[in-house]
Amino acid sequence: MPSSVRRLLIASAKGGVGKSTTAVGIAAEMARMGKKTLLCDLDMTSRSLDMLTGEEDRALFGFSDVIHGKPLDDAVITDVCGIRGLNLLPSTVTESDADFDERLKNTVRDIVSRDDYDFVVVDTGGGISVAEKIAPFFDSVIVTSEQSQTSLRAAEFAGAELQNSGGRNIRLVVCAFDLPSVKREKRAGIVEMIDRSSLKCVGVVPLDKKLQKLQDSGKIPERTESALAYKNIARRLEGYDVPLFYGMRGMRKKLSSAL
């Protein structure tokens, strides 16, 4: 595979922990950084990325069509949400058969091997059954989690299983981090979360009250705290040294209580 193309797999051992939000957030920030980015929706149960980006009306084809031979360029939505360089391959209903796993792997391998994108981000479903099959094709894997003990335990499990399946550079992203709850409810702080998961943390995304409203209207956040967090994560993935909560004045002031 061409070394110039960066390939990132997003996974989680359970649903509802910010996986698809993270996939969209990182892909959008990579495109805003000037990188031609392909975002692929392999969550064949939720199939939510076209909705999160407001592109339902343009999602005429998807991953299952590419599996069955449709050219990728004919299935991809370009300039998603008005962001130049952000492209989306939606998920569509896929019928499993005896050869599905092999065709899935071959199709993903072909997609991430293309040299016409700078960055490829692949979102998978809650649970790691699909992620395990395709993990070896990626440079890096992100596992998402929230603050709860069950979510952190699931992240640790997912990270270990994906590493056993050939995943490399496996990192943790903590989503919907509720700073007041660290003291009020004695929930896990950042250091405790990292210790519990045994994964290197590449970013913490604060709880963003604006996020749900933006997603419901099919808009990708920009200039919100969650968008700033994903911008920081994208820059770290590119090798930049970015402090935790950089650019988030309120979070930086309260950083000591979050650790």
Give the positions of each predicted feature.
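Short, well-ordered alpha-helices that flank and scaffold nucleotide-derived cofactor binding pockets
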Residues: 24, 28-32, 136, 160, ...
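Short, hinge-like loop/turn segments at secondary-structure boundaries
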Residues: 55-59, 161-162, 188-192, 219-223
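Walker A/P-loop NTP-binding active-site region of P-loop NTPases
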Residues: 7-71, 119
